[in-house]
Amino acid sequence: MDIFSFFSADFWQANSLCFMFISAFLSATVLPGNSEVIFVALAVPKLMLGSLFNVDILALILIATAGNSLGSLTTYGIGRWMPKFDPKNYRTLWAINQLRRYGAIALLLSWLPVVGDLFCAIAGWLRLNFVTSSLFIFLGKMVRYVALLFLSTPFLL
């Protein structure tokens, strides 16, 4: 494989789900990933070919959700390693209070920019149950990508 095949359209098309996973994973961490842009760019051509829920669309949703969820669980794991401290930042105090009040169900909002990453890290720091935290993170991320899919369909009509 030569270096120029990396720039070909065939290479990107053949590996689109892999790139979606990587972008979704990075988007859920503090690194930039632009998963929404890539998701819509991959979903729109598939939507133009057929129905709203075909195998390609479902695979795209599952891959994006899995990558984004694993990125958030990485942030959760980093939160578990953080030593106990007395937070003084208003945003951190607010997130801690919300997670103490609502528990792991608050992680349904883990898809939100900035606050979602903070929720995941604090959930790990508070030692919330890993299985229930994973479930709510996964559900929140999936709802986000399904909503993004429905928001992008009016532009096809």
From Swiss-Prot:
Cysteine disulfide links: none
Family named by the database record: To E.coli YqaA.
GO cellular component: plasma membrane
Transmembrane segments annotated in the record for this chain: 3-23, 24-44, 47-67, 105-125
Record's protein name: Uncharacterized protein HI_0489
Organism whose genome encodes this protein: Haemophilus influenzae (strain ATCC 51907 / DSM 11121 / KW20 / Rd)
Keywords from the named record: Cell membrane, Membrane, Transmembrane, Transmembrane helix
Keyword Nucleus: no
Membrane disposition: Multi-pass membrane protein
Localization (cell): Cell membrane
